[in-house]
Curated annotation (Swiss-Prot):
PROSITE patterns: SAM_MT_TRMB. Signal peptide: none annotated. S-adenosyl-L-methionine binds at residues 51, 76, 103, 125. Substrate binds at residues 129, 161. GO terms for cellular component: tRNA methyltransferase complex. The gene is trmB. It is an enzyme of class 2 (transferase). It comes from Wolbachia pipientis wMel. This is tRNA (guanine-N(7)-)-methyltransferase. GO terms for molecular function: tRNA (guanine(46)-N7)-methyltransferase activity.
Length: 221
């Protein structure tokens, strides 16, 4: 089903449910979507990174193990991937992860402005049919929302192996007055399931590093 109660056009659908024991574990890592609870979390953390659509959680695990001082919030509606990540963080006793399994845009809207150091959007659904393009996660409205939430020194990392979507992403970033981007490989990153699939199928992967437009120092690094 698509999340029809959201003000956003649905960009995903859910096809499964968690087993009761896994659902119980998820409660320990779930973030509450209210401005008050999110502001409390933000005020208690030095650094916050957010991944929108974390899949099986490969990138999240890699990042939190290498950056133990940050809080990583992952958003993923597909519960099979959520279950796999929960298993891994329980085995490895990881404490600096929180999860959200509904529409990421509803959660991000409640973040204080200038509070997130980094956003990851890795291989979002390209919705390749022209009639479905309106369902694409990345558009000017959503990018403007992210621009409000990232720190002045923050970055948005986007990856896609769908060339039409890449051109769409570039076009929509250019429509955001507060954002600028360059195409460049990520230096701190691990291959995800969809990246490995792209390499196997010999599809070019395009990486976007997006910064607030007056953060020239970051863009020059």
């Amino acid at each position: 089903m698509l999340f029809k109660n959201s003000k956003w056009i649905g960009s995903f659908s859910r096809r499964s449910r968690l087993k009761p024991d896994v659902d119980e574990i998820l409660e320990k890592y779930s973030i509450q979507n209210s401005k008050e609870s999110i502001e409390k979390i933000v005020n208690s953390q030095k650094r916050i990174w957010v991944e929108i659509g974390f899949g099986n959680g490969e990138n999240m695990l890699y990042q939190v193990l290498n950056e133990p001082d940050l809080l990583f919030i992952g958003c993923e509606p597909y519960l099979k991937g959520v279950s796999r990540l929960l298993t891994n963080i329980e085995i490895q006793n990881i404490k600096n992860i929180l999860m959200w399994t509904e529409d990421a845009r509803e959660l991000i809207a409640n973040f204080p402005d200038n509070s997130v150091e980094r956003f990851f959007i890795l291989f979002p659904d390209p919705w390749p049919k022209r009639s479905h393009n309106k369902r694409r996660l990345i558009n000017t409205e959503f990018l403007n929302l992210l621009a409000k939430k990232i720190l002045i020194t923050g970055e948005i990392f986007i990856a896609t192996d769908h060339q039409d979507y890449a051109e769409w992403i570039a076009s929509h970033i250019k429509q955001c007055n507060s954002l600028i981007y360059r195409e460049d490989d990520f230096t701190s990153y691990t291959l995800t399931k969809y990246h490995r699939r792209a390499l196997k199928d010999q599809r070019k992967v395009r990486f976007f590093k997006v910064s607030v437009i007056n953060n020239l120092q970051t863009m020059d690094q």
